[in-house]
């Protein structure tokens, strides 16, 4: 224990701390200057006070010092127990088992360390490849391997600690065997009180032990050497560096590592024989080696007669008299302990010799005394014989003589003495018998006491067993009690639940009884409630039927409107073709040019003026507020005319038309030519390379613009002469056109039936060839100003343009006369279609209205184009062919749309019939369950079926023509922004109304749009659909029907 604890300053045994305080390792100077004391050398002799005064050659202080050292050594070994052979074998078996477990654990640790190293290398490789990022699975695998390594390392550390404890038990046993050699008999001649105390302490536990012979000592030394080898092998068990890194070294582990380090150094000293070359760091292991060597020499008995030597100097003794404990002091104390053992062994031998001599003398004296006793006994026997012989002689003498009296007195004396001796012998025998009987009784009582003690011990053991049994029974009963409590609580909960269920069932039974006991009185509360519920459901179904019928009529009206729109588009197309034929027949000096080749010298000019011409098709506003409101209400951003024309050609599905319209067509000078890029291209007045920048803007409400060229119709066109870099300025001219509201209304409604795709294609074709213009005959209600400011760089271009305008006056007069007739019919058709849109709330009709406005603007723009852009002719014949093809395609599409509307109406009617049949079947099942109310339910069902099967003709719908006539005054103020808002509102209110959302609103021209109030449009919508706002959408109708079903089931 002391040997194990003196190697480290971090952790110590508690016994050492109590005995020696806080130990510190010896300094290097102490280790260098301290010489281990060898009692077997010829120069060292320990002399105690038991020797004669002549042999004392040391001072009294040195003797006391050595006796104190010996006493401390014996005190240090006091707690070491002398084990029996059985205990030693058990300890050896445990050590063997732990060594096997240690070997297996070390092998596992080596394998786990290699696995951890491989996982670490994999993680590093992944981190290098992915620049610091690695997979989560690799990290988890490395952590798992590290955890296993730590667990095995801690397990190995615990096993080695247990092995060290068993090794220390064996070492303590061996030191106790050494101390057992000090017999108590040898301490009687020691006069020193310290040595007497030492002898008493050492003899307490080893009174019956005998002196060990040489064979036992040799066996003890061999066992010590084997334990030392095992301790050395413990230091070499772990060699894996990764394992040492994984273990976190605490105080106990550091202590074990220091022990291993010392053992490794000790092994190196044994193998390489470095005792002479050791420096100050290796002196402590060298002292351990010297200590073990001295022990082996002592137990082998090589030096039996050591001689006296001079005492150690006082300074060396003082070094060992410190309160701290170290390995050197421990060795020094054990040296003195062994010297005391040797001296007392010698004194014991001398005392034995003296005892033998005294025994011989005593035997001789005893023999002499026995001889004297035998002689005295013989003498007494002879005296007795002589006395008896004299008495017999006296009896033989005659009686007359006097000696007879003498003889009688002698006989009496002799009888008295014999009687006295017999009495004494009897008393002694009696006393002996009494003593023997008492001794026997004491022995019997002792045996009885021992048996009683054994019985009490057995009873105590039995009581302990009974107590354990009772405790186990108590715990078992307690567990059963807890289980019973749980079962009781569970049963209570079950009973409570059953009670609740019973109460609920009773309540239901009472309800059923009350329902069964209801009288047939029709005036009862139950019958009244049921009738009210059926009436409410009947009303709901009636309202639903009315809504569905109104929707059917709405779809039919939409179908009629589409047919009218398609007819109107066809009429407009024919009129357009007529106008184009008129322009083609004009014989002018300079032919018309509506576009330039795609890859000709004017391509750069086309690209420069695309944005400027797109501004023509989009409106300009008098203020920022107007611009903001209309831009917010538009459903999609305004596309340029090139994109519109591409969309129109793509919707028609003909790639050939697109290619023909997109490419330039070379024709003779007398034939006009139409191109897709005509609007977006620039028109030069003189054909030079550098074009004149022209801006075309539409200003409403007479917005004044500087540098503007006035545009007029007919013969009113005047182009003033200008010089170089001079800007033409003039006031904008208002263009008016009267609208005939009363004439041709019915005719326009019949003819105006445009389709969606025809509108797109035809409007795109017209807009690609003409500019925006206004006629002088437009009514005051539609007032817009069209100004075309032109920045002129070359005066030659201006002069040439003025000449071309003068040449085209005659053709324009003739075109205006034809155009006024077209505008009158188109504007009337516009008002009628607007009235239909307000009443029927259909988004496609609003788009058709916008498209018709674009057509009007396009036709009016023909005059402006004829005045301002007259350069080359185009192919009108190709445009006519394309228009005819588009008309055919639009008719096919309109037929498909009408068929789709019919299919949708049929599907809605079939869904309605299915729902009515489902409700009818549910009511029949519920009526079968109610036997009492069977007759009343049948009557209600019959009335319900009659109300559900309401014909569509019974529902009154307001005539759309009347609506259009009533709202004609208000329709003059309608704008497309309000119409788009209304269409959006209708979509949000009823998702089931599938309007045609494919109608493009991008081609709507806002130049001639007027404004209306939102309130008039909303009133018209409410008048047209009065009940749709109440019930919302078809989805809400379905939810209302399901709720009515639940009400009927609850009432049943």
Curated annotation (Swiss-Prot):
GO cellular component labels: cell division site; cell tip; cytosol; division septum
Chain positions with Phosphothreonine modification: 60
Subcellular location: Cytoplasm; Cell tip
Location, primary (coarse class): cytoplasm
Keywords: Cell cycle, Cell division, Cytoplasm, Phosphoprotein
Modification Phosphoserine, positions: 51-53, 57, 59
Basic and acidic residues composition-biased segments: 670-679, 750-760, 791-812
GO terms of biological process kind: mitotic division septum assembly
Keyword presence, DNA-binding: no
Signals that turn on the gene: Expression is increased between late G2 and G1/S.
Keyword Cytoplasm: yes
Biased composition (Polar residues): 631-669
Pfam families: Uds1 (PF15456)
Annotated spans, Disordered: 616-687, 726-760, 788-820
Top-level taxon of the source organism: Eukaryota
Physiological role: Involved in septation.
Protein name: Up-regulated during septation protein 1
Gene name in the database record: uds1
